[in-house]
A protein has these predicted regions:
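Protein kinase glycine-rich loop
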Residues: 13-19, 24
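AlphaC helix of the eukaryotic protein kinase fold
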Residues: 42-64
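Activation-segment/catalytic-loop signature of the eukaryotic protein kinase fold
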Residues: 76
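Conserved short submotifs of the Hanks-type protein kinase catalytic core
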Residues: 80-94, 98
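Activation segment signature within eukaryotic-like protein kinase domains
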Residues: 113-114
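Protein kinase catalytic-loop region centered on the HRD/HxD motif
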Residues: 119-129
Length: 294
């Protein structure tokens, strides 16, 4: 660690996570008198304009959102030529870690998590923000039980250029196992519908402990998204209600026009599916046949 105090305000106490893009430190804010997370971008602003631009995008994106299920940002700055973000220190476990510990999650758990994730994602979309990297690793269950979305490093506000997965150039924005087909083809920009595709895959992972399309070879995963039939959730986990499987299928349609067009549509169907699961006698047979006819 190159510093112990940032801007004579934030006292660094621990390195709590690092990757190619950034390092996250636990710190104490001497003005607010509370623990915070400091995300220090691994670049020199004078030498890496691309990384600095990504940082500015993340800071602008996160500052635009105020929601219980989205991590809060308190400020940003530059110290020793390194940009940093000051955020809530989120105590808890990632959804990915929770899935690993349990192999798969139960219907009640999946429903509870999904409703909170949808709430946070709706706040993003209402601000014209697309997350672009929805996945279990970027969803944290706090010690108080609330779920929050984190890591807006690849998000954007409003109109941006189309983003491609390029096989020979290996250009990837997001995580390949959760990228919507239209992003892989490059024929549409990221949208609420591509976030919904990733959310459907996240839901699949919650129920099975696996991604539907996965391989150590990224071009193979891309081709699966584009051409392979979506695998059955119930084949891996027969306890999943068919109504929930149908919802996942609709989230993950290859044609974005056949998916839920916004997260509120998804929320409504989840509420109906959960009511059917908890009170099956109250629901008419065949009620969900309309899911793919909307």
């Amino acid at each position: 660690m190159e510093f112990n105090v940032i801007d004579e305000r934030y006292i660094i106490s621990a390195d709590v996570g690092h990757g190619g893009y950034a390092t996250v430190f636990l710190a104490f804010d001497q003005i607010r008198r509370k623990q915070v997370a400091i995300k220090v971008i691994n670049c020199d602003i004078n030498n890496d304009k691309k990384a600095y631009n990504m940082f500015q995008q993340e800071a602008m994106t996160m500052a635009a959102i105020s929601n219980l299920n989205v991590v809060s940002i308190y400020g940003s700055g530059i110290y020793n030529n390194k940009p940093y973000l000051v955020m809530d220190y989120v105590r808890g476990k990632s959804l990915k870690d929770i899935i690993r510990e349990n192999s798969y999650l139960l219907v009640d758990e999946v429903y509870t998590y999904m409703m909170q994730i949808i709430n946070g994602l709706e706040a993003c979309h209402n601000c014209n923000i697309v997350h672009r990297d929805i996945k279990p690793q970027n969803i944290i269950k706090k010690t108080d039980g609330n779920v929050v979305l984190i890591d807006f490093g690849t998000a954007y506000i409003g109109e941006v250029e189309r983003n491609l997965y390029v096989e020979d150039g290996a250009i990837i924005i997001g995580t390949i196992q959760l990228l919507a087909p239209e992003l892989l083809r490059g024929d549409e920009k990221a949208s609420a519908r591509s976030d919904i595709y990733a959310l459907g895959i996240t839901m699949y992972d919650m129920f099975t402990g696996k991604y539907p399309f996965d391989s150590t070879d990224k071009p193979t995963v891309a081709k699966m998204h584009l051409f392979s039939p979506f695998p059955s959730v119930r084949k891996l986990n027969p306890s999943v209600p068919v109504e929930f499987e149908n919802i996942i299928y609709k989230c993950c349609q290859k044609d974005p026009s056949l998916r839920y067009q916004n997260v509120n549509e998804l929320r409504v169907d989840l509420m109906i599916a959960y009511e059917s699961y908890k009170n099956p006698k109250k629901m008419k047979k065949g009620f969900f046949s309309w899911l793919f006819k909307k």
